[in-house]
Amino acid sequence: MKKIIILLIVGLIFISGCARTVTQRPKGYLGISISFYRQLILSIDGSYYAFIIAFNENNVITEDPNTWQYYIEYDGFNQKFMWGINDFSSYGTLLSGKFSEDGTNFSFKISLNLFSNATSLYMKIFYFVYDPFVYDPLQGFRDLYWQYPDSESIRIDLSTYPYSYNSVLTGNIISGLSLWIE
């Protein structure tokens, strides 16, 4: 009788532990820190930088904005951090990021609640220098020719806690990327 009770207790603990690790999703924030080789100047002499981090819960991200479910933009022209969704119907100042004093590091946090019940998230960084004296006026993101080289989509596992990712990137603008869940 004792063996049966012990077996049932061990089985119950095992099953509840498995269910918890499969279904539990961390609540909190996704932290992102990006390091640059040189000081990032977001506007100079009439030109400005568009710095975009795109997200998708299901698929790999490409340069096509239709593959972005959400994005964060730092618009050097307006000097604002903006949050948007892929159909551009919702676009506004939702978050604030922080630049280091020397302008070589940018960090911010995003609430995981924004990504509904997703267990993974794809992220890709885009970077563009826009000179209004050289290019015609923009008609939206579709007209930008992204200049960030060697960028692959990064898969973030939201079901793993704690999660962290550190990478040294090979592009000529961004030197390092750190991600974490807290």
Model-derived features: where do they sit?
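Sec-dependent bacterial lipoprotein signal peptides
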Residues: 1-18
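Surface-exposed extracytoplasmic segments
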Residues: 18-182
